[in-house]
């Protein structure tokens, strides 16, 4: 058996098209243009690529895109002052500070300073608490993308056994909350969990977000399970050429056992920016007291 490939390119394109349609509707019906402000501190090459992608996709969706670039040695107070300015700006509905920040800056203080109503990364403790309480919240983009991809295979996740391997604030913990809100039965595990292979073999849904290249092997997967691989790891090429990207799952092994699986690259990573656009539209609608958009 060879697993169905859950194609992030196709799914993210469909999601961006739905976002663009909602943006057009909000503009036409209410005269509001959703706006996303991205703050980049320093010049990390990977962050530069990601910010360019966000800017391009935001504009393609018909939204306003604002970029704010600060030097790596910017004082904390200056960064917080910029966030306060964006919090008060009525044309900005979403604020994202590109992480990680350079050394010397307090990421937690920066995240705490973002207005929860504009926190499109979903990392402010207010949004984390609302999510845990089952209330409306802006949700971290990668976990949201994981749920959307799982629902491409299963119309409902209710009653399914799910395992989340990884416990980060960015992916693992919010993903657990989203799965609980879908009425799945959830196990959260990590690299130090006892007998992790046995835990994985019990799961109908495996979400790998541990940050270790190909840690989850094919014989850890229950036959027919759905595997969502969040990992993006750069590893040396065996032939000495360009480094290659691999996930947290041994893809070649797992696809012979799983019922459906996301590839790396071409899977969850493409959903992250698409879900950022979703959060920006949701934030704009909530700020202006509009009904929740159809995305």
Curated annotation (Swiss-Prot):
InterPro entries: Aminoacid_DH-like_N_sf, NAD(P)-bd_dom_sf, THF_DH/CycHdrlase, THF_DH/CycHdrlase_cat_dom, THF_DH/CycHdrlase_CS, THF_DH/CycHdrlase_NAD-bd_dom
Pathway: One-carbon metabolism; tetrahydrofolate interconversion
Domain of life: Bacteria
Keyword NADP appears in the UniProt entry: yes
One Gene Ontology term from the biological process aspect of the record: L-histidine biosynthetic process
Catalysed reaction equations from the record: (6R)-5,10-methylene-5,6,7,8-tetrahydrofolate + NADP(+) = (6R)-5,10-methenyltetrahydrofolate + NADPH; (6R)-5,10-methenyltetrahydrofolate + H2O = (6R)-10-formyltetrahydrofolate + H(+)
EC number(s) on file: 1.5.1.5, 3.5.4.9
MF terms (GO), sorted A to Z: methenyltetrahydrofolate cyclohydrolase activity; methylenetetrahydrofolate dehydrogenase (NADP+) activity
UniProt cross-references to Pfam families, sorted A to Z: THF_DHG_CYH, THF_DHG_CYH_C
Keywords for the protein's UniProt record, in alphabetical order: Amino-acid biosynthesis, Histidine biosynthesis, Hydrolase, Methionine biosynthesis, Multifunctional enzyme, NADP, One-carbon metabolism, Oxidoreductase, Purine biosynthesis
Alphabetical list of Gene3D superfamilies matching this protein: Leucine Dehydrogenase, chain A, domain 1, NAD(P)-binding Rossmann-like Domain
GO CC, alphabetical: cytosol
Binding site for NADP(+): 166-168, 191, 232
Quaternary structure and interacting proteins, as annotated: Homodimer.
The protein's role, per its UniProt record: Catalyzes the oxidation of 5,10-methylenetetrahydrofolate to 5,10-methenyltetrahydrofolate and then the hydrolysis of 5,10-methenyltetrahydrofolate to 10-formyltetrahydrofolate.
UniProt family annotation: Belongs to the tetrahydrofolate dehydrogenase/cyclohydrolase family.
Protein name: Bifunctional protein FolD
Naturally occurring in which organism (per UniProt): Rhodopseudomonas palustris (strain BisA53)
